[in-house]
Amino acid sequence: FVGHSMGGMIAWRYALDNLDQLNGLIIIGSAFFGNEQEFENFQTINAPPVAFELIESKFFIRLLEYITPRILVKEGISQSVYDQSIVTDELVDQFHDIILMEGTRVAVGRLAEVHEDDFIANPLDLRKITIPSLIVHGEEDNLVDIKFIDHFIEQIPNAKLISYPKTGHMIPMEVPLQLSEDIREFIN
């Protein structure tokens, strides 16, 4: 089971409840919080892009359902990657087009409804994840500082960490060949 970013949170939560259905777990650019203080520290250290802050406002959530300025998309991507040379007009257009697809903006708005309790769990619960697990992180991740993956490494018995230098949050875009090779090696 593979998850990136918030999908990583979904992946480890799914793994806790469905270990018998999984052969392995891959968590990419995701965080784990063992208590409210860790979550508050995360929010203090990691400055989200303006677009992410806007979805916390009910007014902007409704507004973004109808208009999504391209500049917000570009700013969100720029803050999520280490190497700014990959933030091309073509990439921004691709992301913007995806956001403009029917239902996407409503779904993004629903992210604001996720409660902080959804992000917090007992670190000891991770010990239940006994399947081989690969934890992947960018060392220059501005959205999820690498220190917020410690619980994965400390508590998951069969966890292996791979961190990429000069890589931000968008690992699949920033180092796609290296990531796919590392995943292939992990699976084999």
Predicted regions, residues:
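Conserved alpha/beta-hydrolase catalytic His-Asp/Glu region
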Residues: I61-R127
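Conserved alpha/beta-hydrolase "acid-adjacent" motif
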Residues: N142-F148
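Short glycine-enriched nucleophile-adjacent loop
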Residues: G8-L19, L25
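Conserved alpha/beta-hydrolase "nucleophile elbow" surrounding the catalytic nucleophile
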Residues: G3-G8, G138
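Short beta-strand immediately N-terminal to the catalytic nucleophile in serine-hydrolase-like folds
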Residues: F1-G3, I28
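Flexible "cap/lid" loop of the alpha/beta hydrolase fold
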Residues: L16, L25-I61
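Short beta-strand/loop motif that positions the catalytic acidic residue
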Residues: I129, I135-H137, D141
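Catalytic active-site module of serine/aspartate enzymes centered on a nucleophile-bearing elbow/loop
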Residues: P157-N188
